[in-house]
Amino acid sequence: SYVVAVKRDRDSRGGSAFIHDHMRIGDVIAVSPPRNNFPLNEDAEHTVLIAGGIGITPILSMVRRLALNGSSFDLHYSCRNAAEVAFYEELGQFGNLNLHLSECGGRLFDLGTIIAEAPQGAHFYCCGPKSMIDAFELAATGINASQVHVERFSNDSEVAVEGGFVVKPQREGRSFAIPPGRTILSVLKEAGLDVAFSCEQGICGTC
């Protein structure tokens, strides 16, 4: 079975609002097979997990697996306040939870110190807001890239506003012009092609 955590986002494209407003217990939905672009290295001698807000979702699976294996790990979870802490009851069962509540006078989320105090060879995993991941990657400068893992909710790349190009799908006998400001996926979908996709942001790699 799946456990899916979806935070209602007023700036979303509508998916989170639909789930909160319309989906009910007993509804049947179609889902694609799971994909994992944020795999856990279970052979690491120590693991440092860093989550912000709903970024705890993929991290929680890692917590469960590491705890099951009896592996050494630390979890740092940052939220604005206690009301935004997801899965608190389950996470509270782990003695190595470090909770950071920015609006409640809690301990500052010092990524540099967290990284510096980790054992040599530790693997680091971070998922959360863009600002957190950017700060984490900066603080992790100097750590072997194979030990640093992130999962983002949005793509930093911007769609080109100048130029344009032509694509010819391998299984199609025709070409498609991609104008400035458009993505290949949006043009192919508009043309009626059956293109596999998921996030529509160029992150997951499905398309």
Give the positions of each predicted feature.
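Conserved S-adenosyl-L-methionine
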Residues: R65-F73, N144
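Ferredoxin-reductase
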Residues: S1-S32, N36, E42-H46, C79-N81
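Short hydrophobic segments within beta-strands
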Residues: K7, I50, H76-S78, C126-C127, ...
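Histidine-anchored nucleotide/phosphate-binding helix
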Residues: I56-A67
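A short, well-structured juxtamembrane/interface segment
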Residues: S32-N41, G106-I114
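Short, glycine-rich nucleotide/cofactor-binding loops
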Residues: H46-T57
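Structural motif
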Residues: H46-V48, D74, H123
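Reductase modules of NAD(P)H-dependent flavoproteins
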Residues: N81-C207
